[in-house]
Swiss-Prot record:
This is Probable fructoselysine/psicoselysine transporter FrlA. The keyword Membrane applies. Pathway: Carbohydrate metabolism; fructoselysine degradation. It is a multi-pass membrane protein. GO terms for molecular function: L-amino acid transmembrane transporter activity. Belongs to the amino acid-polyamine-organocation (APC) superfamily. Keywords: Amino-acid transport, Cell inner membrane, Cell membrane, Membrane, Transmembrane, Transmembrane helix, Transport. The chain crosses the membrane at residues 10-30, 38-58, 93-113, 121-141, 155-175, 181-201, 236-256, 273-293, 334-354, 355-375, 389-410, 417-435.
Length: 445
């Protein structure tokens, strides 16, 4: 077993690229239409993306403080553990591993193949093998070098931003102001009302998730006291500007009633640009593949650090804590999580059911934001960066997360509750086993 610790090798730009690259994923290709349908007017659609991004800032402030107080790998698991609840910390990691981390790899890999299928016909079985090959390729990349993986992540993040910049540039040139003056749609509630704006903001929520992924790797980040706050808040502002400009130009490119009813808003909007026309679909398919490739790469890179942290505490399979003696990466954790992701590729029906675990993951985030209150009561709590206006920021972080929990519960109440029961029913016995084993190992040492 490799016994050495992971080293701090990641600088600010690599960390920023991971945060932005994880956040800007396939969701934005459909969320503009969903937000437009919920908000009901072009201006409220744009405003929803602005406010949706601003709401995330308090959450990133909480993560920034916690990550500088506990600059180690593991994110939510570490924060809940230090807040005084090892069982909750374990359950958060348990749920993440089985219901979020590995399945997300399969979902993204299959999404890349789906977009590839837009360009050329692909046999379904062959497509699954291509998806598996993508996961294996990124496993090898991130297993061999954290610096090499970070360099690739920086390049792919730049590559995924370029097409959006092109869309924004073309959109400004072909922008039609009359689309903002056209009659509004009959969206949720009274059009233009406060409730419609809230609905629009809620619809942006998933587009802004992913920035806190870098907290999984805090133990490998140089100067975390400065790097983490800058990367977390900076990535939020960058994504906010990108999404707001996209929403603005797309709302100005096509009639709003068509936008609000579009399942592929970016692709449909680009067909209104004469320079692209029928090639818009190809452009979007290629862009989507680049975007999802970046997200898949970042997930293969950061997610295994959670199980690594749990294994180091003797609360997970010991092999997950192995560090490669030459490459200084959590090699076994990367391999096994990737292997589970490949398994899910070939069990697609099971993967679709795992979406119902979203309620559990949202509630886990709420608990993490609340953990800062208990952490601040500890005598040994000494963060290198503190959240400004702590009471207000923490309240906003918890409240915005609870709203997401509520909306997720409304989407699938019974399946969500069943999944919560599954996590507890399987997680608590597993925790009892590893906690007992951990005590025995500590007694022997």
């Amino acid at each position: 077993m490799g016994s050495q610790e992971l080293q701090r090798k990641l600088g600010f730009w690599a960390v920023l690229a991971i945060a932005v690259g994880t956040t800007v994923g396939s969701g934005i290709f459909v969320s503009v239409g969903e937000v437009a349908k919920a908000a009901g007017t072009p201006w409220l659609t744009v405003l929803a993306f602005v406010i949706g991004g601003l709401i995330v800032i308090p959450q990133m402030c909480v993560y920034a403080e916690l990550s500088t107080a506990y600059p180690e790998n593991g994110a939510d698991y570490v924060y809940l553990k230090n807040a005084g609840s090892r069982p909750l910390a374990f359950l958060s990691g348990w749920a993440s591993f089985w219901a979020n981390d590995a399945p997300s790899l399969s979902i993204m890999a299959l999404a890349i193949v789906s977009n590839l299928g837009f360009l050329t016909p692909i046999d379904p079985l062959l497509g699954k093998f291509i998806a598996a090959g993508l996961i294996i390729a990124f496993m090898l990349l991130h297993l061999r070098s954290v610096e090499g993986g970070a360099a690739f992540q920086t390049l792919i993040t730049i590559a995924k931003i370029i097409p959006f910049t092109i869309v924004i540039g073309l959109g400004i040139f072909w922008f039609k102001a009359e689309n903002f003056a056209a009659p509004t749609t009959t969206a949720i509630g009274a059009t233009g009302s406060f409730m419609a704006l809230l609905a629009g903001i809620s619809a942006t929520s998933w587009s802004y998730t992913g920035m806190a992924s870098i907290c999984y790797m805090t133990g490998e980040i140089k100067n975390p006291g400065k790097t983490m706050p800058r990367a977390l808040i900076g990535s939020c502002l960058l994504v906010l500007v990108l999404y707001t400009l996209l929403a603005l130009v797309i709302s100005g490119l096509m009639p709003f009633d068509k936008l609000a009813n579009s399942e592929t808003p970016i692709s449909d909007a680009l067909t209104w640009i004469p320079a692209l026309g029928s090639t818009a679909g190809i452009f979007v398919a290629i862009t989507a593949m680049i975007v999802i490739l970046g997200s898949l790469s970042s997930c293969v890179m950061y997610q295994p650090r959670l199980e690594y942290a749990m294994a180091k505490d003797n609360l997970f399979f010991k092999c997950f804590g192995h560090v490669h003696p030459k490459y200084n990466t959590p090699d076994v954790s990367i391999i096994l999580q990737g292997a589970l992701g490949i398994f899910f590729i070939f069990v697609s029906d099971l993967t679709s059911l795992l979406g119902y675990f979203t309620l559990v993951m949202c509630f886990k985030n709420t608990l993490t934001f609340g953990s800062i209150i208990w952490c601040r009561k500890r005598d040994d709590y000494k963060p290198l960066w503190r959240t400004p206006a702590f009471g207000l920021m923490t309240t906003l972080a918890i409240a915005s997360s609870l709203i997401l929990v509520a909306s997720t519960f409304v989407w699938a109440p019974i399946p969500g509750l069943i999944c919560a029961v599954i996590v507890i029913a399987t997680g608590l016995p597993a925790y009892a086993f590893w906690a007992k084993r951990s005590r025995q190992l500590n007694a022997l040492s």
